[in-house]
């Protein structure tokens, strides 16, 4: 690992990027953390299903879970619709009927990025700031695909770490 490269798997990278994009689109920091974690979770779940690691839940169970969520709405972030609720503290993405708390997401990011979290966050903020919100909303996932860690395809790559190159993220902002 060099100072500008971080060995990390894709889930925390997507979590952080989605949170940074959500802030740029107008959500506050805590709301963005909750939404970012939900997006990465849904992405991992769909990838896991495609690889045969997770099996989809029966339709009846999904319908019950949706009814039990109460007053929810959907937030579109990086091309995915995320279930959310308006809690006392602000917007929170939900998993099942449970809101995702931002403090837990911040601890997760700190544990995965370690001391490199501030620099990774800074690079991603610079990239997000290079775009107007509407353009970022449209291109955000494609940008992530350009800088995400490269890992082996298929089941062998599940959970594998790759290099997150902070210089590559910064170059995308300049090339914009």
PLM regions and their residue ranges:
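Solvent-exposed interaction surfaces and binding hotspots enriched for charged
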Residues: 1-176
């Amino acid at each position: 690992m060099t100072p500008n490269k971080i060995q990390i798997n894709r889930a925390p990278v997507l979590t952080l990027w989605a949170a940074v994009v959500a802030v740029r689109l107008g959500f506050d920091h805590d709301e963005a953390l909750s939404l970012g974690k939900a997006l990465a979770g849904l992405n991992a779940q769909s990838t896991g299903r495609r690889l045969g690691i997770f099996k989809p839940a029966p339709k009846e169970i999904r319908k019950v879970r949706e009814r039990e969520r109460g007053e929810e709405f959907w937030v579109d972030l990086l091309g995915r619709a995320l279930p959310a609720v308006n809690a006392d503290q602000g917007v929170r993405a939900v998993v099942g009927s449970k809101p995702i708390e931002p403090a837990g997401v911040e601890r997760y990011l700190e544990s995965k990025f370690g001391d490199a979290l501030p620099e990774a966050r800074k690079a991603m903020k610079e990239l997000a700031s290079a775009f107007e919100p509407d353009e970022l909303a449209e291109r955000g996932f494609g940008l992530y695909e350009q800088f995400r860690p490269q890992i082996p395809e298929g089941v062998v790559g599940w959970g594998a770490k790759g290099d997150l190159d902070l210089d590559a993220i910064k170059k995308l902002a300049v090339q914009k």
